[in-house]
Amino acid sequence: MIKKIILSLGVLLLTIALSAQKPFDLKTGDILFQTNKARTSFVKAIENVTTSLDDLNFSHVGVVLVEDGQVFVLEATQPDVCKTPLEKFLKQAKSVDGNPVVVVGRPKPKYQKSIPRAIEILKSFLGKPYDYVFLPDNDKYYCSEIIYLAFLRPNGKPIFKATPMSFKDKETGETSPLWKKHFERHKTPIPEGILGTSPGEMSRSKAIKIVHRYF
């Protein structure tokens, strides 16, 4: 009897292990939220002023493109908007027990029809420079901005919500010294209160359903 229980337990554990190793089937239009492994002042500054799903401190986001059997991520990153192989995107994430801290959000059924148009808009941004100062209408783009713009409805109404940006530390309520240095370096006033987006806010959007975690 004990041997049967041990054998059954072993089979169960093996099944769980194999299930965990099975690749997730990404679809074009899936949105990948990433906690970046690079601990630069820029990444820390983003994490200090935004709130993410389950406090995961997302500092980056991109959109999946499945093309000719390969999986890419359309992303606005430094120095420009680009098409990145999925493997490279995952390797750039912080890891937990060897697994990347990346979460997959999938637009809910009512928004699925918006994906083909969104992908074409995202492709039109390829090669555009990264926006280090998070300003609208300057022909430069940051990661969540291209997704916000790509998923605008034809009538201009947004699927993802833009909110007044704040560069104040979540703990102190004061403007983060990291951001002060950042905007001084770019000789630009801090765009406090200007409408914008962030990976953290987008990860909590009601327009998507979290369908997978890589960690």
Can you name each region flagged by the protein language model?
Residues I6, G10-S19:
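Hydrophobic h-region of N-terminal signal peptides that target proteins for export
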Residues M1-I5:
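Positively charged n-region of N-terminal signal peptides that target proteins for export
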Residues I16, A20-F215:
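Cysteine-nucleophile amide-bond enzymes
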